Amino acid sequence: MKIAHINNTSGIASIIAKEQKKQGHEVDIFVFNKIIHSQFGGNMINYKSPFARWNLFKKIKEYEVWHYHYPYGSLKRSLEKRNKDKVYLKHYHGGDLRGKYDNDFCLVSTPDLLKYSPNGKWLPTPIDIGEMKGEIFSSPERNETIQEDRCHLRIAHYPYYENFPSTDYYSKTLLTLAHEKKCEIVEILRLPHIQALKAVNSCDIVIGKILPDVGWFGKFELEGMALGKPVIAYVSDELYKVYKPPIYRTTKESFKKDLENLLEDISERQRLGKEGSGYIRNFHSVESVTKIVQESYNLLHTMN
């Protein structure tokens, strides 16, 4: 098949496309954001340029499949005017669907989005486990079992809330614990993807998102789990009962206490690290995710 991935949210299209190419498909990725392009690659399109837009719509006519990541705004409207006879797969990633509604068959990247898409299917975020097994991601030469002082523990933290200070449930706690020399905070921000993975791999704990209105987590947390790191994050009771991810669960109210407990509990960290990497292999492998994607293409093809 000739497949166009439109957008590349969190590099997910890149991971899927790599596996699709192995299977013999002809695949291209079109991106519209310079940061995403610098991190994950793809064909950069200046969507503000009328000529670039015209050229994009002309180019993608050649593809059988339009796999559209983060369907939103004027691009979504323009594609839907032109998608006749195409396998047009909408793949939602969060704010593009949350609080809205889509009755079509589609894919969603987190299970909380299923409430907004009654005919949707959850596609677990693919994690390139093979990439992480490379030499540069091997575990640092540090033996946690002989560490008696918690100040040696490094905590990976992605301050995603930088532009939304009202959702910063972390900084006060992290500054306090660092000042008390209970841990070292490693901010994962504005790094090329490979460097970000290396930084996470040098840490002992990954702090994930606390999103009470969402109740789930994203690729950053999954990559930490794939690297064998214990992850602390918020997972709603509703979603935990169904999916039971190996996450050290916390809330915005209990975050400080929960993080201190995790810092103190070596056996729990080891358990979560082991179970987390197994969880990724079982549910987030590139092969299993790409199989679901192909089944989705086939389903939409029969519906055309």
Name each model-derived stretch.
Residues 264-298:
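A charged, aromatic-enriched C-terminal amphipathic alpha-helix characteristic of glycosyltransferases
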Residues 226-233:
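Short hydrophobic beta-strand element within catalytic cores of glycosyltransferases
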Residues 65-67, 81-99, 104-109, 121-126:
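Active-site proximal beta-strand in glycosyltransferases
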Residues 104-143:
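Donor nucleotide-sugar binding/catalytic pocket of nucleotide-sugar-dependent glycosyltransferases
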Residues 68-74:
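Short His-centered aromatic/hydrophobic patch
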Residues 201-213, 229:
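Acidic donor-binding loop of glycosyltransferase active sites
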Residues 128-196:
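Conserved catalytic-core segment of nucleotide-activated headgroup transferases in glycan assembly
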